[in-house]
Amino acid sequence: MSLTFYWYPKCGTCRKAKKWLEEHGKEINEIHIAEQPPSKEELKALYEKSGLDLKKFFNTSGMKYRELNLKEKLYHMSEDEQLELLASDGMLIKRPLTTDGEKVTVGFKEDQFEENWA
């Protein structure tokens, strides 16, 4: 089973996650999240499969998030507007974003990876 792995190569957390997946023998399809962010439709599908709050998909520690003052603005945006915004700039998306087409993880927590991808 191949995993789709949206990542940013300069991100330390992404590199740790990639190393974990490789050490566990996972075949990964790497996609540079800033150069090829998922489309709005892809994000909607990932969000629905994840069972997470859509706000968990935002990179809240990113410069772009802070520049746009999204902490305040997200509460006033519809789900559709939030998905549109995420699709417009891969740097707004919390990374890495990993999926096998059924399960989805956002970010890298070893216990979540163990539970989903081991």
Curated annotation (Swiss-Prot):
Q: Mind telling me which Gene3D superfamilies this protein's record contains? A: Glutaredoxin
Which parts of the chain are coiled coil?
Answer: none
Q: PROSITE patterns in the record, alphabetically?
A: ARSC
Keywords from UniProt, A to Z, are: Disulfide bond, Oxidoreductase, Redox-active center
- CDD domains from the UniProt entry: ArsC_like
UniProt keyword annotation of Cell cycle present: no
| Disulfide bond residue pairs | C11-C14
One molecular function GO term is: oxidoreductase activity
What family, per the record? Belongs to the ArsC family.
Q: Entry's PANTHER family?
A: ARSENATE REDUCTASE, PROTEIN YFFB
| Name of the protein this chain belongs to | Uncharacterized protein YusI
Q: Which organism is it from?
A: Bacillus subtilis (strain 168)
Instruction: Write the lineage as a comma-separated list.
Output: Bacteria, Bacillati, Bacillota, Bacilli, Bacillales
